[in-house]
Protein backbone atom coordinates (compact mmCIF):
# COMPACT_ATOMS: atom_id res chain seq x y z
CA UNK A 1 0.00 0.00 0.00
CA UNK A 2 1.26 3.47 -0.83
CA UNK A 3 2.18 5.64 2.13
CA UNK A 4 -0.35 8.38 2.81
CA UNK A 5 -0.66 11.14 5.33
CA UNK A 6 -4.31 11.09 6.32
CA UNK A 7 -5.44 13.78 8.70
CA UNK A 8 -8.54 13.98 10.82
CA UNK A 9 -11.21 16.28 9.38
CA UNK A 10 -11.49 17.89 12.81
CA UNK A 11 -7.91 19.19 12.69
CA UNK A 12 -7.00 22.47 11.04
CA UNK A 13 -8.72 22.67 7.66
CA UNK A 14 -6.64 22.50 4.52
CA UNK A 15 -7.31 24.66 1.51
CA UNK A 16 -8.88 22.89 -1.46
CA UNK A 17 -5.55 23.12 -3.28
CA UNK A 18 -3.75 21.47 -0.34
CA UNK A 19 -6.36 18.73 -0.29
CA UNK A 20 -5.74 17.91 -3.96
CA UNK A 21 -1.97 18.09 -3.47
CA UNK A 22 -2.22 15.64 -0.56
CA UNK A 23 -3.59 12.97 -2.92
CA UNK A 24 -1.81 14.10 -6.09
CA UNK A 25 -0.26 10.70 -6.90
CA UNK A 26 -3.81 9.38 -7.42
CA UNK A 27 -5.07 12.30 -9.53
CA UNK A 28 -5.25 11.89 -13.31
CA UNK A 29 -3.03 14.42 -15.11
CA UNK A 30 -4.50 13.95 -18.59
CA UNK A 31 -7.72 12.11 -19.32
CA UNK A 32 -7.17 9.73 -22.20
CA UNK A 33 -7.81 6.07 -21.85
CA UNK A 34 -7.12 5.21 -18.23
CA UNK A 35 -9.91 4.01 -15.95
CA UNK A 36 -10.86 6.88 -13.70
CA UNK A 37 -13.69 8.28 -11.62
CA UNK A 38 -14.46 11.89 -10.67
CA UNK A 39 -14.97 12.20 -6.92
CA UNK A 40 -16.83 15.17 -5.49
CA UNK A 41 -19.35 15.44 -2.66
CA UNK A 42 -23.06 16.12 -2.48
CA UNK A 43 -22.49 18.99 -0.05
CA UNK A 44 -20.18 20.83 -2.41
CA UNK A 45 -22.44 20.12 -5.38
CA UNK A 46 -25.50 21.42 -3.51
CA UNK A 47 -23.53 24.55 -2.61
CA UNK A 48 -22.75 25.13 -6.30
CA UNK A 49 -19.21 23.73 -6.34
CA UNK A 50 -17.95 20.98 -8.62
CA UNK A 51 -14.71 20.66 -6.62
CA UNK A 52 -13.25 17.20 -6.80
CA UNK A 53 -10.70 15.29 -8.82
CA UNK A 54 -10.38 12.57 -11.42
CA UNK A 55 -8.82 9.60 -9.62
CA UNK A 56 -6.78 7.05 -11.58
CA UNK A 57 -8.18 3.69 -10.48
CA UNK A 58 -4.98 1.89 -11.53
CA UNK A 59 -3.18 3.56 -8.63
CA UNK A 60 -5.12 1.84 -5.85
CA UNK A 61 -4.12 -1.38 -4.13
CA UNK A 62 -7.39 -1.79 -2.23
CA UNK A 63 -10.90 -0.48 -1.74
CA UNK A 64 -9.87 0.87 1.67
CA UNK A 65 -7.07 2.89 0.08
CA UNK A 66 -9.52 4.27 -2.51
CA UNK A 67 -12.00 5.35 0.16
CA UNK A 68 -9.23 6.88 2.30
CA UNK A 69 -8.05 8.96 -0.66
CA UNK A 70 -11.61 10.10 -1.46
CA UNK A 71 -12.07 11.21 2.14
CA UNK A 72 -8.66 12.92 2.21
CA UNK A 73 -9.58 14.80 -0.97
CA UNK A 74 -12.62 16.13 0.88
CA UNK A 75 -11.04 16.54 4.32
CA UNK A 76 -12.65 19.97 4.64
CA UNK A 77 -15.94 18.17 5.35
CA UNK A 78 -16.40 16.36 8.65
CA UNK A 79 -18.17 13.35 7.13
CA UNK A 80 -18.12 13.76 3.33
CA UNK A 81 -20.99 12.18 1.41
CA UNK A 82 -19.06 11.15 -1.68
CA UNK A 83 -20.51 11.78 -5.12
CA UNK A 84 -18.97 10.08 -8.13
CA UNK A 85 -19.91 12.55 -10.84
CA UNK A 86 -18.37 10.87 -13.88
CA UNK A 87 -16.34 7.84 -14.94
CA UNK A 88 -14.43 6.45 -17.87
CA UNK A 89 -12.93 3.22 -19.19
CA UNK A 90 -14.89 0.64 -17.24
CA UNK A 91 -18.35 -0.86 -17.88
CA UNK A 92 -21.27 1.53 -17.38
CA UNK A 93 -23.16 -1.15 -15.47
CA UNK A 94 -20.74 -0.68 -12.58
CA UNK A 95 -21.01 3.09 -12.34
CA UNK A 96 -23.15 4.73 -9.68
CA UNK A 97 -23.14 8.40 -8.77
CA UNK A 98 -23.97 7.75 -5.16
CA UNK A 99 -21.70 4.90 -4.17
CA UNK A 100 -18.99 2.47 -5.04
CA UNK A 101 -18.92 -0.59 -2.85
CA UNK A 102 -16.04 -3.00 -2.45
CA UNK A 103 -17.54 -5.62 -4.78
CA UNK A 104 -17.87 -3.13 -7.64
CA UNK A 105 -14.42 -1.71 -6.96
CA UNK A 106 -12.92 -5.22 -7.12
CA UNK A 107 -14.73 -5.88 -10.43
CA UNK A 108 -13.34 -2.67 -11.90
CA UNK A 109 -9.80 -3.55 -10.80
CA UNK A 110 -10.13 -7.06 -12.30
CA UNK A 111 -11.48 -5.55 -15.53
CA UNK A 112 -8.69 -3.00 -15.90
CA UNK A 113 -6.08 -5.71 -15.35
CA UNK A 114 -7.37 -7.55 -18.45
CA UNK A 115 -5.63 -6.95 -21.76
CA UNK A 116 -7.57 -5.09 -24.49
CA UNK A 117 -8.73 -8.25 -26.27
CA UNK A 118 -10.05 -9.79 -23.08
CA UNK A 119 -11.82 -6.53 -22.15
CA UNK A 120 -13.55 -6.52 -25.55
CA UNK A 121 -14.56 -10.15 -25.11
CA UNK A 122 -15.89 -9.40 -21.62
CA UNK A 123 -17.98 -6.48 -22.92
CA UNK A 124 -19.39 -8.73 -25.67
CA UNK A 125 -20.14 -11.43 -23.08
CA UNK A 126 -22.01 -8.97 -20.85
CA UNK A 127 -23.92 -7.60 -23.84
CA UNK A 128 -24.94 -11.08 -24.98
CA UNK A 129 -25.73 -12.61 -21.58
CA UNK A 130 -26.49 -9.71 -19.23
CA UNK A 131 -24.12 -11.39 -16.77
CA UNK A 132 -21.37 -9.06 -15.51
CA UNK A 133 -19.69 -11.70 -13.34
CA UNK A 134 -16.01 -11.84 -14.18
CA UNK A 135 -15.68 -15.38 -12.83
CA UNK A 136 -18.58 -16.59 -15.03
CA UNK A 137 -16.99 -14.86 -18.01
CA UNK A 138 -13.61 -16.44 -17.32
CA UNK A 139 -15.20 -19.89 -17.03
CA UNK A 140 -16.66 -19.41 -20.52
CA UNK A 141 -13.68 -17.54 -22.00
CA UNK A 142 -11.04 -20.20 -21.38
Task: Annotate each PLM feature.
Residues 1-142:
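Acidic interaction surfaces
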